[in-house]
């Protein structure tokens, strides 16, 4: 397994993304990016709290599956609710993660952190972000995404203390040993297409080149995890 990670501040005053890479007691590999929500307070703390609570819960379950991942996110959601009440604030995070055990992957997300599964530069699967624009497209309320460009950052699900908004998206697959998983915050996928991303990854020092040419001057924080086999 080959792992790369990258995070940066962009043009923001602080980095409110949090990367968690660790191993569960079961032997599964755990990868997560939590993105503190813009417009809320203490996003860096929220991202850390969410990540730590999800990992801690899953570290002690007998098996990793959709139900237990949802329970882990609910635990994190409760922790954020308590944090918000204690500090009299609104805070929260969006998440995207991959848990790998043997040749099975569990992909999960809440909000607009995206996860891709790649095979030989072909996208086998990509998450569909929980955003207002996607909800309107699915309901046929709008025909073209560009008509709601200014609303693309509004998420419909998050880990922010509201149980009704923290339902995960989930995808599980048995993968081959030449697969690649990519997790990235919206500061990345709103800046560069997956096709451009893959072109850079195929080059020497690709992820660093990607940062220097595209990401350092973005308006948002940016975070990436790549997991290759």
Model regions: which residues?
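PP2C/PPM-type serine/threonine phosphatase catalytic domain
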Residues: 1-229
